[in-house]
A protein has these predicted regions:
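Short, structured beta-strand/loop micro-motifs enriched in basic residues and often containing a Trp
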Residues: 119-129
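OB-fold ssDNA-binding interfaces and closely related basic DNA-contact patches used
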Residues: 1-115, 128-135, 150-197, 203-223
Length: 224
């Protein structure tokens, strides 16, 4: 036997994996179940025995329209660190990707994604909610991250956003004074414009500002 001076090889028995979830319009963070478990969960749903933490829905669009799919559902990430944030083009849509990890040994990265730019050329509600809190986020500190949806009693419109706690403190938007109930900071407002004889709102200045802040934050995370 060769004397290698203590140098040896230990096989790696565990492999870090990545878990992908998507924030849906109903505020749930959803992970599609693999084919092996999907049939079992769909059958349980049909028998009225669906386990907590799962749901079954029927696809309404695309080539698989009408097909039932099983999904794991979540609404919170606890004691995690945001380690990366970036955007990507997917199926003709610009999306925001947030990568979380609880920083424990062999813990998987959690990729949370949602629409970044919507059909109105403005920033999606969940992405906008995060971006407006960026100035108050402490990079390298753990956080609790959750998603929500509510209906505005005055307008009847749905509002969506995220809630972040760091060091037991709820992070607020950096662009609103919640005591004086007024806007603050240099974030621009949407402009009312006339198109084809109709008045509408142009969110371009807001979107450009928020995208700039998101890109700065993305670089800051990479440099940390």
């Amino acid at each position: 036997m060769n004397n290698n001076g203590g140098l040896g090889f230990t096989p790696q028995t565990s492999v870090n994996k990545t878990i992908y979830v998507e924030i849906k319009p109903d505020s749930l963070m959803v992970r599609r179940v693999g084919e092996q478990d999907s049939a079992r969960i769909i059958k349980a749903d049909e028998e009225g025995n669906l386990e907590q933490g799962y749901r079954v829905r029927t696809l309404e669009m695309g080539p698989n329209k009408g097909t039932k799919v099983a999904e794991e559902i979540y609404n919170v990430l606890s004691k995690v660190q945001l380690v990366k944030a970036f955007s990507e083009e997917k199926f003709g849509q610009r999306r925001m990707i947030l990568v979380f990890n609880n920083m424990l040994d062999d813990s998987p990265n959690i990729h949370v994604q949602c629409t970044l730019i919507n059909d109105y050329n403005s920033v999606n509600g969940y992405a906008s909610s995060l971006i407006d809190r960026i100035p108050n986020i402490k990079i390298g500190k753990t956080m609790d991250f959750s998603t929500w949806k509510m209906t505005d009693k005055n307008t009847g419109k749905d509002r969506r956003g995220i809630t972040i706690y760091q060091e037991n403190e709820k992070l607020q938007s950096a662009y609103y004074d919640y005591v004086k109930m007024e806007r603050i900071g240099d974030k621009p407002s949407a402009k009312k414009v006339k198109k084809l004889g109709k008045e509408t709102w142009d969110f371009t200045p807001v979107a450009e500002y928020q995208l700039g802040k998101f890109e700065e934050f993305s670089k800051a995370l990479d440099d940390y």
